[in-house]
Amino acid sequence: PFAVINADDYYGKEAFVKIHEFLVENYTPEKSKELCMAGFILGNTLSDNGTVTRGICAVDENDYLTDVVETYEIKKTSDGAESQGNRIDVNAHVSMNMWGLTPEFVGLLEEGFVEFFENIKGDEAKELKGEYLLPIYIDELLKKGTVSVRLLETQDKWFGVTYKEDKPV
């Protein structure tokens, strides 16, 4: 098993420890479609310098993901956060693209990529700018019942370099 992260984000130690422990303690070939994701608290992941995109997560009573909704243009406000005029709970769990995956998942990812590529073929704009987004694909697999994803809550504070102002001087 392995972890996948964004290259321009700092996630914090707790998130790495939780992903590692889950993969070490839970992975077997029989459980190859049981994945995990670090669930950050939205308020710990907002930039002071502009908007961000986050996967807003819904979980069941056992902390398994039931839904991930990519939410664009989330900005900090004086009393919380909003996206395109809609308030968002700053205590909501969000995906920061820190996933614990299995070798068997790579085959599913490949199948999905072939389908994605076939769907954009012939559309020049999509061929040049289309993105195969991991959270969206994992959400599709969740909805089909192909995989399960355990949300591992972390209190870590994220910071990234989305904006040049995010980088410390």
Model-inferred region functions:
Residues 1, 24-30, 116-120:
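Alpha-helix termini
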Residues 2-10:
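Short beta-strand-to-loop acidic/aromatic patch adjacent to the donor-nucleotide binding site
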Residues 4, 37-38, 151:
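Structural beta-sheet core signal
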Residues 7, 40, 154:
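Cofactor-binding loop segments of dinucleotide-utilizing enzymes, especially the Rossmann-like FAD-
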Residues 10-12, 158:
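Short, active-site-adjacent cap segments at secondary-structure transitions
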Residues 12-99, 103:
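Conserved core of the sugar-phosphate nucleotidyltransferase
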Residues 59-61, 68-169:
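Conserved alpha/beta core of the MobA/IspD/sugar-nucleotide pyrophosphorylase nucleotidyltransferase superfamily
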